C-alpha cells in the first residue's frame, strides 16, 4: 500500500528541488517562447490524477481492457468538448503530441514515396511538414511552398506547384508565421488538384477557439493541433476531421501508431477544452493578440525589424541582423535578464539552425499572467534595452531588476 504522506519532497528531495527551482523560474522570468504557456491548476490536477494508472487501448465503448467505464467518460468528454469548441464533425484526442497527430495523418492517407506539399521550414513551416531529417521528409516526397517578397505566404507559387506536382496531401500551418492564413483559398486548391487538405493549427488553436483567428475546420479535411501553446492545456495532440475520415484516422492513431492512450493527459485535455469554451477565454485571446501587436510595435519603434512587418496573431519573428547579433547570442543575453525566448531562423536565414539571425517571440504566457498592452510595451522596451547594449553587465542587471518588479506584480499562480 502506498502512504500518501510519502510525498516527492520526502522520497526524492533531489528531484523535488529541481521542480521547485523550475517553479521559481517560471514565476520570476517573463516567458516569451511562443509555443509555451501556463496551464490552470484544474488541468494539472486532472493530469496528476490516478487516471495515469489505467490502460485503455481502443476507444470509448470499444476497449481491449476491462475497467474502462470511468476513463471512457473522461475521453468522451474530451471528444465532445473539442468538437463543439471548433465545430468539427469528428475528433480523436489520443495523440501524445502534435507530431504524432501529423504522423497519423500521413499514415492514414499516404504511402512511402507519395508527394505532399507543406510550408518550407526555412520560411516558417514546421519540421513535420517535410524537413529532410524528419520522417515526413525521409519517407515521402515533400514539395515546399514559401513566402513572397512581402514575407507573406506566396499563394500563387503554392497554386502553381500544386497544379504541377498533383500532391496527395496539402498542409497549411506554421511554427513561425505571424500573419493570417487563407484556409479557404488553400481548401479550394486542394479540391481542384484532388488532394487531402490538412491544417496544422498547433500554434493558433487557442486563437481559433476564441474566434480571433480564422477557423480552418470548415475548409479542411483534417485539422491537427497540440493542446498546449495558445490552447493552454496539457502537452498533447488532437485530430479534428470530417466524419468520412474518422475511421481512417482512428485506425491510424490506434493501432497504427500508438498503443495505450495517456488517460490522465486526456482528462487534462477535457478540462482545458471546458475552460476554452468559457467567455473569459475569448477575452484572454483578444488580449493575446493585442499584446503581441503592442510588443511588435514597440520593437519596431526601437529600431528592430519584424518579419512580415508585424503580426496578426500571438507570434512574431525579430530580425537581428541590423544589430550584428545572432539569435543564439540574443537568446542567451535576454535569458540573463530573465526574459525567455528562443533563437529562430528568419526567412532564408544565412546562419545555421543552432545559431540563426532571429528570435521568435510570443504573447500567450505573459498574457496568462495578466499582462496587458502597457506591460507588453514595457517588455518590448526591456528587450530593446538589452539588445542595444548586450555586453554591459550593469545594463543587464538593471533590466533584470525591472523584470523582477514586473513579475512580482503579476504572479502566474496566486
Swiss-Prot record:
Q: CDD domains this protein is in?
A: SHMT
Which protein, by its recorded name, is this?
Serine hydroxymethyltransferase
Keyword Magnesium assigned = no
What is known about its subunit structure?
Homodimer.
Origin organism is: Polynucleobacter asymbioticus (strain DSM 18221 / CIP 109841 / QLW-P1DMWA-1)
Q: Write the Enzyme Commission number(s) for this entry.
A: 2.1.2.1
UniProt binding sites for (6S)-5,6,7,8-tetrahydrofolate: 121, 125-127
Q: In which pathway does it act?
A: One-carbon metabolism; tetrahydrofolate interconversion; Amino-acid biosynthesis; glycine biosynthesis; glycine from L-serine: step 1/1
GO cellular component annotations, sorted alphabetically? cytosol
Q: Enumerate the Gene3D superfamilies for this protein.
A: Aspartate Aminotransferase, domain 1, Type I PLP-dependent aspartate aminotransferase-like (Major domain)
Q: Which family does it belong to?
A: Belongs to the SHMT family.
Check the record and name the HAMAP family matching this protein: SHMT (MF_00051)
Name of the encoding gene = glyA
State where it is primarily located.
cytoplasm
Reaction(s) catalysed by this chain, per the record, are:
(6R)-5,10-methylene-5,6,7,8-tetrahydrofolate + glycine + H2O = (6S)-5,6,7,8-tetrahydrofolate + L-serine
Q: Which cofactor does it need?
A: pyridoxal 5'-phosphate
Q: Which Pfam families match?
A: SHMT
Amino acid at each position: 500500500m502506498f502512504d500518501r504522506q510519502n510525498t516527492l519532497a520526502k522520497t526524492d528531495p533531489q528531484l523535488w528541488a529541481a521542480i521547485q527551482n523550475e517553479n521559481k523560474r517560471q514565476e520570476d522570468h517573463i516567458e516569451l517562447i511562443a509555443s509555451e504557456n501556463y496551464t490552470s491548476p484544474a488541468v494539472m490536477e486532472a493530469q496528476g490524477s490516478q487516471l495515469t494508472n489505467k490502460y485503455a487501448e481502443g476507444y470509448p465503448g470499444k476497449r481491449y481492457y476491462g475497467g474502462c467505464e470511468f476513463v471512457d467518460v473522461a475521453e468522451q468528454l474530451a471528444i465532445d468538448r473539442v468538437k463543439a469548441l471548433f465545430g468539427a464533425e469528428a475528433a480523436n484526442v489520443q495523440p501524445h503530441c502534435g507530431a504524432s497527430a501529423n504522423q497519423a495523418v500521413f499514415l492514414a492517407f499516404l504511402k512511402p514515396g507519395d508527394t505532399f506539399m507543406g510550408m518550407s521550414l526555412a520560411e516558417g513551416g514546421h519540421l513535420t511538414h517535410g524537413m529532410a531529417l524528419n520522417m515526413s521528409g525521409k519517407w515521402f516526397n515533400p514539395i515546399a511552398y514559401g513566402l513572397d517578397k512581402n514575407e507573406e505566404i506566396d499563394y500563387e507559387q503554392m497554386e502553381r506547384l500544386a497544379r504541377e506536382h498533383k500532391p496527395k496531401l496539402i498542409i497549411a500551418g506554421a511554427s513561425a508565421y505571424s500573419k493570417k492564413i487563407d484556409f479557404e483559398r488553400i481548401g479550394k486548391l486542394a479540391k481542384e488538384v484532388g488532394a487531402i487538405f490538412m491544417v496544422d493549427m498547433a500554434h493558433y488553436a487557442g486563437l481559433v477557439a476564441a474566434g480571433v483567428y480564422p477557423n480552418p475546420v470548415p475548409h479542411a479535411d483534417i485539422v491537427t493541433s497540440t493542446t498546449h501553446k495558445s490552447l493552454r492545456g496539457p502537452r498533447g495532440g488532437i485530430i479534428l476531421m470530417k466524419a468520412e475520415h474518422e475511421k481512417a484516422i482512428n485506425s491510424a492513431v490506434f493501432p497504427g501508431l500508438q498503443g495505450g492512450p495517456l488517460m490522465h493527459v486526456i482528462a487534462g485535455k477535457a478540462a482545458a477544452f471546458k475552460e476554452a469554451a468559457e467567455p473569459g477565454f475569448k477575452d484572454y485571446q483578444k488580449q493575446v493578440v493585442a499584446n503581441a501587436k503592442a510588443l511588435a510595435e514597440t520593437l519596431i519603434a526601437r529600431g528592430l525589424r519584424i518579419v512580415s512587418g508585424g503580426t496578426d496573431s500571438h507570434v512574431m519573428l525579430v530580425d537581428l541582423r541590423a544589430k550584428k547579433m545572432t539569435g543564439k547570442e540574443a537568446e542567451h543575453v535576454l535569458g540573463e535578464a530573465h526574459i525567455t525566448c528562443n533563437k529562430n531562423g528568419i526567412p532564408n536565414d544565412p546562419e545555421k539552425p543552432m545559431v540563426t539571425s532571429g528570435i521568435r517571440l510570443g504573447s500567450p504566457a505573459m498574457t496568462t499572467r495578466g499582462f496587458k498592452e502597457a506591460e507588453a510595451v514595457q517588455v518590448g522596451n526591456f528587450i530593446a534595452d538589452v539588445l542595444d547594449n548586450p555586453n554591459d553587465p550593469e545594463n543587464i542587471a538593471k533590466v533584470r531588476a525591472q523584470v523582477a518588479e514586473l513579475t512580482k506584480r503579476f504572479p502566474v499562480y496566486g
